[in-house]
Amino acid sequence: MALGLGALSLLSGCCMPSYVESARPAAEDDAMSRPFLAPLILTEDPLQDAIVRVVGSVSCTGTLISEDLVLTAHHCVVEHNEKGEVVHRDLAPEVVHVELGGDDLPWGDVSVRAIVTPACGYEQGDGDLAILVLDRKLVGMPTFTPRLTQAPEIGEEVSPWGFGRCALSSRAVRRESRLGGKIDRVTSGLFNAEASICPGDSGGPVLSRSREVVGVISASVMDTDPRTRGRSHFARLDKYQQLFSAAQEIAAGRSASELPPFRSCEGTPQPGRTAKAD
């Protein structure tokens, strides 16, 4: 639904994907069995190349947290009915792919072979995170470290990143560092800060000053201006350590059915203050 100038809405930061024609290898099975090799020259800050686009039924943002795992938002990889309403069911992995590069003209495209999610967060909020298991390792690509053993802290400065675009953005879709701020509220599954978020930023990393991923962009109050800070909601990672462990096991070749239960939304968050800041 289009936003009028100055109108505010609480939206998840997704947008419809652009169409990208992908070249297919002549010997697809053989090519898919080989690891992906990153180009020799990436961006001036190579770590930024770990922030990628996630494209399924909508277009979102994700973060490489290992050579074959991408962290994003759960609501970015769920099914919708014919009315566009969220169905509490994940997309098939083959419907989702990851685009590499800093804008809407990717230099690489990688398929997904498994989607690891909690049994909540289908629309936004607590549990709004998903880990995509890629069909090949991205050898040579930089990765970010998710902070799983320390809770977000009130007063901690955070910076969101994403591939979103607001109506008044002067540039085409590209990787952007958003205006962030200090965390002012922490609950059992979320934390909040005033930040500038655009549609398409959902799933993007929320980075600490030490450049660890402390959360995932879930939802925000947005208008048409990318410089406007609004009330933003970020999903905590530390509550879902078992989800990250399961994703690593699945990436290593184990079946999800072989693993202990990992989709529970009754995780164990690390201790943190939950009162609103003064």
List PLM regions with ranges.
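C-terminal subregion of chymotrypsin/trypsin-like serine protease catalytic domains
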Residues: 16-27, 65, 69, 77, ...
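Catalytic histidine site
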Residues: 44-91
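Active-site-proximal beta-strand/loop segments in catalytic clefts of secreted hydrolases
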Residues: 55-57, 65-67, 73-75, 100-101, ...
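Active-site region of chymotrypsin-like
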Residues: 41-60, 135-143, 167-249
